[in-house]
């Protein structure tokens, strides 16, 4: 794929700009990188946790919200892992621009959304605990308002996670030591993208 030819609303494609290598960049010099990329086991956990939560919401079992509960969904897809999405996410994760979104990450197939999470502690936070940070944003979500400029910063990770039309996910990660703490950094890319302003994340059942 010639990523330099892929169009986005702004910016140069991440893989065009940084190349295909997923080796941590010199920007990572202040960190002791322990591992690059999710393990096979973590890939399964990422997909399973997303689908568990998507089904919970789809079945109308998510009681949290502003107001809760969240309505059931009639059109929720199950997500599958996509290696291309994961590779693009990993190239970006390996730039060590912690908690910054890249500008252009689309594939030839579709526009691509993104969630980022990060946590540190005396022991390594596991991948599911990072995903739950996104799920917990449901507490601030009012389904009837959908995605607005006002609520996007508070609920955008949740809404991308449960965006019904999204079908594929691929994630990159870094595990590293800094200041005697173990850090886990996760970037998930989603296709087709969710989080269109003025839209609802799924069709109410």
Swiss-Prot record:
InterPro entries per UniProt: Allrgn_V5/Tpx1_CS, CAP_dom, CAP_sf, CRISP-related, V5_allergen-like
Cysteine pairs bridged by disulfides in the record: 4-16, 8-104, 28-96, 171-188
The keyword Membrane belongs to this UniProt entry's keyword annotation: no
Subcellular location: Secreted
Transmembrane segments: none
Expression (tissue specificity): Expressed by the venom gland.
Keywords (A to Z) from UniProt: Allergen, Disulfide bond, Secreted
SMART domains, alphabetized: SCP
Domain SCP: 47-190
Major location (coarse): secreted
Recorded GO CC terms: extracellular region
Entry keyword Cytoplasm: no
UniProt record similarity statement: Belongs to the CRISP family. Venom allergen 5-like subfamily.
PANTHER family given in the database record: CYSTEINE-RICH SECRETORY PROTEIN-RELATED
Protein name: Venom allergen 5
Species name: Polistes fuscatus
């Amino acid at each position: 794929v010639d990523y330099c030819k892929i169009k986005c609303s702004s910016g140069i494609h991440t893989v065009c700009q940084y190349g295909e290598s997923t080796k941590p960049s010199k920007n990572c010099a202040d960190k002791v990188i322990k591992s690059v990329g999710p393990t096979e086991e973590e890939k399964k956990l990422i997909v399973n946790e997303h689908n568990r939560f998507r089904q919970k919401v789809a079945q109308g079992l998510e009681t949290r919200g502003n107001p809760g509960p969240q309505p059931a969904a009639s059109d929720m897809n199950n997500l599958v892992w996509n290696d291309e999405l994961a590779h693009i996410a990993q190239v970006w994760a390996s730039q060590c621009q912690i908690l910054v979104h890249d500008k252009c990450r689309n594939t030839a197939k579709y526009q691509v959304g993104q969630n980022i999470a990060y946590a540190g502690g005396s022991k390594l936070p596991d991948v599911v605990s990072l995903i739950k940070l996104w799920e917990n944003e449901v507490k601030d979500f009012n389904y009837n308002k959908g995605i607005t400029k006002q609520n996007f910063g508070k609920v955008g990770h949740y809404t991308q996670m449960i965006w019904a039309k999204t079908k594929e996910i691929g994630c990159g990660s870094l595990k590293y030591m800094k200041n005697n703490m173990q850090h886990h950094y996760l970037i998930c890319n989603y296709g087709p993208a969710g989080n269109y302003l003025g839209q609802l994340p799924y069709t109410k059942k």
